[in-house]
C-alpha cells in the first residue's frame, strides 16, 4: 500500500502479519501439540487422543521421539507467534522531495534496536537498482544505492513481484527521485 502526492511518497510495508504466517503458525502449533499429547499419553499409558490408542506407541523409542518433536514444534510455533505479534519487518519508506530526505523505518525484534530508522539525503542516492536472479527460485529485488552506504533493499525477498511489477515500481521511484535505474 502506498500514498503519493507531488512531493512525498510513503510506501507502507506489511511485515510478518500475513495470512500465510498465521496459517503456518497455527498448523505447526496444532501438529506439535498432537505429537506431544501422543508422546505423553504413551508415557502415562492413558488415552488422551481418542482416535490413537496409547497401546500402539511404546514410550521407548516412539514416545520419546514424538515428545521431542512436539516440544521442538511448540518452540518454533511460539517463535512464529512472537514474530507475528511483534509485527517484525513492518514499517514504511518515506521519500520527501520537498525536504530532500528519505526515511526508512522497520520494526525489529524487541531490545535496544527494536526501531530501525535510517535517514538519507536524496542527493546521496546514486541509483535505483533491480537485482534479478533467474532459475527455479527466480527473485527480483529493488535496491537503493546510497553514496558511501551501499545498497539498501526496498522490497522483501519473499515479495513475489513479477518482472513487470518490479520494473514499474523501479521506474516510478527513479522518476520520483530523479535518479537512474541499474539492472544487475
Curated annotation (Swiss-Prot):
Its main location: plastid. GO terms for cellular component: chloroplast thylakoid membrane; photosystem I. Keywords: Chloroplast, Membrane, Photosynthesis, Plastid, Thylakoid, Transmembrane, Transmembrane helix. It comes from the Eukaryota. The chain crosses the membrane at residues 19-39, 57-77. HAMAP family: Ycf4. This is Photosystem I assembly protein Ycf4. It comes from Jasminum nudiflorum (Winter jasmine). The lineage of its organism: Eukaryota, Viridiplantae, Streptophyta, Embryophyta, Tracheophyta. The gene is ycf4.
Amino acid at each position: 500500500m502506498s500514498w503519493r502526492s507531488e512531493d512525498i511518497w510513503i510506501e507502507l510495508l506489511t511485515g510478518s502479519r500475513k495470512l500465510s504466517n498465521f496459517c503456518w503458525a497455527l498448523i505447526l502449533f496444532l501438529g506439535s501439540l498432537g505429537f506431544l499429547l501422543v508422546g505423553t499419553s504413551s508415557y502415562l499409558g492413558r488415552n488422551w487422543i481418542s482416535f490413537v490408542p496409547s497401546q500402539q506407541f511404546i514410550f521407548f523409542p516412539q514416545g520419546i521421539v514424538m515428545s521431542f518433536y512436539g516440544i521442538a514444534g511448540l518452540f518454533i510455533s511460539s517463535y512464529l507467534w512472537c514474530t507475528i505479534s511483534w509485527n517484525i519487518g513492518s514499517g514504511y519508506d518515506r521519500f520527501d522531495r520537498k525536504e530532500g530526505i528519505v526515511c526508512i523505518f522497520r520494526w525489529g525484534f524487541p531490545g535496544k534496536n527494536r526501531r530501525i530508522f535510517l535517514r538519507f539525503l536524496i542527493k546521496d542516492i546514486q541509483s535505483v537498482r533491480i537485482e534479478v536472479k533467474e532459475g527455479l527460485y527466480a527473485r527480483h529485488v529493488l535496491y537503493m544505492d546510497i553514496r558511501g552506504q551501499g545498497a539498501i533493499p526496498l522490497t522483501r525477498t519473499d515479495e513475489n513481484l513479477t518482472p513487470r511489477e518490479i520494473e514499474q515500481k523501479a521506474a516510478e521511484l527513479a522518476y520520483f527521485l530523479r535518479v537512474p535505474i541499474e539492472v544487475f
